[in-house]
Amino acid sequence: MQDAITAVINSADVQGKYLDGAAMDKLKNYFASGELRVRAASVISANAATIVKEAVAKSLLYSDVTRPGGNMYTTRRYAACIRDLDYYLRYATYAMLAGDASILDERVLNGLKETYNSLGVPISSTVQAIQAIKEVTASLVGADAGKEMGVYLDYICSGLS
C-alpha cells in the first residue's frame, strides 16, 4: 500500500529528478483535501453498519438473490455478503485517506472476480450493492466527500466488471 505522497516521490526518485510543478500540484491537492477526507472517514467509520444495511435494503433485499434459490438465500450466504460489503467500504475508506487505490488492488481485487465467478456469486448484484454504498455514503458525508469516496468505490466496481 502506498499513499499519494509516496507515489509522487517514488515516481520522481525512479527518474532521478527533483519534484516538478505537476508533482508539487499533486501534493498540494492531496494536502488541501486532507481535512475533507479525514472528516469523511470519521463519519463513515461511525456509520459503517448503517451504510451497509441501507445499501443492502436499496439494492439487494427485495431482489431475486435473496429469494429461495437465490445466491444470498441462506442466512450464511447473506451474512457473507454483508461481510464482503463492509470489507469493500472499509478498504475504500483506507484508499480515500491514502489518496491512492493501490491497497484496493493488493487487498481487495486481486483474484476476487475469479473467486466470485467460481462460487457463483453474481458480480452484477455485487456492483449494484457497491453503487448503493456510494449513494448512501454520499448522503452522509456530503457531495464533495462523497465524490472523493466514490472514486474508490467505482474503482472496486471497475475491477469486478
Swiss-Prot record:
GO terms for cellular component: phycobilisome; plasma membrane-derived thylakoid membrane. Belongs to the phycobiliprotein family. It holds the Pfam family Phycobilisome. Heterodimer of an alpha and a beta chain. GO terms for biological process: photosynthesis. The modification N4-methylasparagine is found at residue 71. The gene is apcB. The keyword Secreted does not apply. It is found in: Cellular thylakoid membrane. It comes from the Bacteria. (2R,3E)-phycocyanobilin binds at residue 81. It is a peripheral membrane protein. This is Allophycocyanin beta chain. Keywords: Antenna complex, Bile pigment, Chromophore, Electron transport, Membrane, Methylation, Photosynthesis, Phycobilisome, Thylakoid, Transport. Contains one covalently linked phycocyanobilin chromophore. Light-harvesting photosynthetic bile pigment-protein from the phycobiliprotein complex. Allophycocyanin has a maximum absorption at approximately 650 nanometers. PANTHER family: ALLOPHYCOCYANIN BETA CHAIN, PHYCOBILISOME 32.1 KDA LINKER POLYPEPTIDE, PHYCOCYANIN-ASSOCIATED, ROD 2-RELATED. SUPFAM superfamilies: Globin-like.
